[in-house]
């Protein structure tokens, strides 16, 4: 479903990024699956391609979680919470990555800023976000359910 709605997810990501940039004082707009902003007197943009979207990774974990929940006794609630948290961390990391690319382009110029931030900083942010999301996901999905005793706070 996420992969089929990939275009809508990428449009949402671009709109969210435009909102984030505007909140920190950078004039920006979403245009389809891209966020655009003025740079050196002209409008430029960063596109959310399929590889730059949270949809494929989230879909992969959703499918894996469904298979795992079917094969072993996992709480569906824990799986849903885990996938939701995973998607949220992926989204935050991706928004931070794109904001970093925009900031570096504004600081270093279009070509050099994109090159440095997309390859080096963007990859580092994505890797840290991925690891954090997976660790959180595993902890949430595999945690022992809490049992409440009557009258306990």
Cite the ranges covered by each PLM segment.
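Hydrophobic N-terminal alpha-helices or hydrophobic patches in metabolic proteins across all domains
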Residues: 1-153
């Amino acid at each position: 479903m996420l992969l089929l709605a990939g275009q809508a997810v990428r449009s949402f990501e671009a709109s969210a990024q435009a909102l984030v940039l505007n909140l920190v004082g950078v004039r920006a707009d979403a245009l389809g699956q891209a966020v655009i902003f003025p740079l050196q007197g002209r409008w430029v943009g960063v596109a959310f391609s399929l590889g730059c979207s949270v949809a494929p990774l989230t879909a992969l974990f959703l499918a894996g979680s469904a298979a795992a929940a079917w094969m072993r006794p996992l709480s569906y609630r824990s799986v849903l919470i885990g996938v939701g948290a995973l998607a949220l961390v992926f989204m935050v990391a991706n928004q931070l990555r794109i904001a970093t690319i925009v900031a570096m382009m504004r600081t270093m110029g279009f070509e050099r800023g994109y090159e440095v931030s997309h390859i080096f900083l963007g990859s580092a942010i994505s890797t840290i976000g991925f690891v954090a999301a997976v660790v959180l996901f595993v902890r949430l999905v595999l945690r022992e359910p809490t049992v409440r005793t009557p009258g306990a706070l």
